[in-house]
């Protein structure tokens, strides 16, 4: 249930919004943000999902309301499907143990998907705001949380213009899990990297002083990108050869993976956005479903390897190659780039 007093604000201007039964609006009424099924819509652009995708999400939400959220996933996608496993695997939320969460924390999760992180996150926090660019997925996340008895979740559709529809300095933690590489994909006015930089600046803006940003994204120079002979696929589904994929990766134009960066480049982007005290983690064996988060300093990498039972890759080639990578270089070729970064005000440090 949306309350009249929230952290929602007009994207771009930051202007306070008035709330009514139909949604949110600016005080002069010139900008309107309608609410559908409890989900306000702050999207700047029309949806890019095709008709089949839209209809699938409509079916999913109808099934969720009548049969329950988990039964709807089974009915629409099948219990053995990759998407069912992906959005019900509790291990995907393991990174929450690394975050400074408590029963007073107000958290923003950007990119809720189908609520796979939102629900366990809400169990640990006072209040969770979720933002998702696909309205059908946002509605499913809200329904999933309601059916789980989580009344402390507010989900909105928005962020496609790399603007966050929230007031400044409102959140203790902002979570950006496997979103950064895609965050500017729908923004039509600026280049992708400029959109990503704007997105990081927005995350900095909405955090409280001393708040933390969690970023987990793909690594342009991961071993899998560079050496996995399976290659990948382009946006039209065609296979890419290993060499072509490597060359695309090197220049940051592997569209199948979104716009990705090196460890050093992303570090610089976070610092330029204002973040400090960057902590980096190696999500092993892979950043989507990790079983371990290892600090990337050489001593921690060596200790994790020596402890045994560490799976160092999710493909045959990466499992063979990663143990050979010197500890100081692991952060450069690990599957994903994972950071916990802190906001300080100018001149504070």
What are the language-model segments listed below?
Residues 4-6, 16-76:
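N-terminal, positively charged/glycine-rich alpha-helical extensions of SAM-dependent methyltransferases
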Residues 82-105:
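Conserved alpha-helix/loop element of class I SAM-dependent methyltransferases that forms part
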Residues 162-174:
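A short acidic, Gly/Pro-enriched loop at the edge of an enzyme's catalytic core
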Residues 214-240:
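Conserved class I S-adenosyl-L-methionine
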Residues 257-274, 280:
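Short alpha-helix
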Residues 279-348:
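A C-terminal cap/extension of S-adenosyl-L-methionine-dependent methyltransferases
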């Amino acid at each position: 249930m949306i309350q009249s007093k929230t952290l929602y604000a007009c994207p771009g201007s930051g202007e306070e919004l008035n709330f009514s039964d139909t949604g949110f609006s600016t005080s002069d009424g010139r900008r309107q943000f309608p609410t559908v099924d409890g989900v306000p819509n702050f999207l700047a652009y029309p949806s890019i999902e095709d008709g089949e995708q839209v209809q699938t999400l409509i079916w999913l939400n109808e099934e969720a309301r009548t049969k329950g959220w988990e039964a709807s996933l089974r009915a629409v996608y099948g219990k053995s499907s990759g998407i069912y496993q992906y959005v019900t695997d509790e291990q995907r939320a393991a990174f929450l143990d690394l975050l400074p969460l408590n029963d007073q924390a107000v958290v923003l999760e950007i990119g809720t998907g189908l609520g796979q992180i939102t629900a366990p996150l809400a169990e640990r926090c006072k209040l969770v705001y979720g933002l998702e660019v696909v309205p059908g997925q946002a509605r499913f996340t809200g329904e999933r949380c309601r059916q789980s008895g989580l009344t402390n979740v507010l989900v909105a559709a928005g962020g496609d213009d790399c603007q966050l529809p929230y007031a400044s300095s409102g959140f203790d933690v902002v979570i950006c899990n496997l979103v950064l590489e895609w965050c500017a994909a729908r923004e039509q006015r600026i280049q992708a990297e400029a959109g990503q930089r704007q997105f990081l600046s927005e995350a900095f803006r909405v955090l409280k002083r001393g708040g933390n940003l969690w970023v987990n994204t793909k690594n342009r120079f991961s071993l899998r990108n560079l050496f996995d002979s399976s290659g990948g696929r382009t946006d039209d589904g065609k296979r890419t050869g290993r060499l072509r994929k490597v060359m695309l990766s090197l220049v940051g134009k592997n569209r199948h993976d979104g716009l990705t960066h090196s460890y050093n480049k992303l570090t610089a982007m976070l610092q330029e956005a204002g973040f400090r005290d960057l902590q980096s983690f190696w999500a092993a064996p892979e950043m989507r479903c990790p079983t371990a988060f290892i600090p990337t300093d050489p001593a921690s990498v060596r200790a994790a390897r020596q402890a045994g039972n560490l799976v160092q890759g999710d493909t045959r080639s990466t499992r063979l190659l990663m143990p050979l990578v010197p500890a100081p270089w692991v952060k450069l070729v690990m599957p994903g780039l994972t950071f916990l970064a802190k906001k300080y005000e100018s001149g504070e440090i």
